[in-house]
Amino acid sequence: MLQEPLELSAPLARELAPQLCRRDPQTGESCAWYHGFWQYARLLGLGTSPVGHARFLAEAFGELAVSLKRMQVLIAGAADYSMLAHVLAACRSHGIAAQFTAVDWCETPLELNRWYAQRESVALDTLCSDLLDALPAGSHDVLCTHALLGHIRPADRPRLLTNWRQALRPGGRVITVNRLRPGSPDVPAAFSPVPVSWLNPSM
């Protein structure tokens, strides 16, 4: 089982987040509290990440490896480097030569991805962009996401899927994991102001 270097990346994320995290243009809120804390939450065994779906990712890339030994992989949205770590491990285990691009609207997870890529001596392109804006068109064989749809308003999801389709080459695949909450309101899950205030001293 892949062991991510969380003990090293947690203090790095905490340091980077106040410097790199952006403010939402509509609310003025920064995502620094989230990106700065997320690695520590994972160290405590809280939340979900690709580590819980490593077997699924390995099997999915194993199926692709039957017919495709070289591929362009787009990681669409990233809380940290976990998706890159597990997709890279899956590709290596199946002898796939992959080139990676990570897209997110915040520089903190992109910098964490660059940090991990450098540790693993793997080439990585990054793009700081909203996933609802245009993605690099028609250049990728595989698009990967994890727990993304809950962060996208239902009204915006058709546009997101259109961008996914345009980012993929003909016959390209989407490999994704997303939690389903039957019977719950179709809104993003969110923290209440109280725990947020614990993590953000400025509040």
Predicted regions located by residue number:
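Short N-terminal helix/helix-N-cap motif within the alpha/beta-hydrolase-1
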Residues: L84-A85, I152-P154
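Short catalytic micro-motifs in class I SAM-dependent methyltransferases
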Residues: A147-H151
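Local beta-strand N-terminus motif with an aromatic residue
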Residues: R70, H140-D141
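Non-membrane alpha-helical structural segments and their capping/turn regions in soluble enzymes
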Residues: E107, P154-P158
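Class I (Rossmann-like) S-adenosyl-L-methionine-dependent methyltransferase catalytic domain
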Residues: M1-L135, I175-M203
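A conserved beta-strand element that flanks and buttresses the S-adenosyl-L-methionine
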Residues: C144
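A short glycine-rich, Lys/Arg-flanked "PGG" loop and its adjoining helix->strand segment in the class I
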Residues: P158-P170
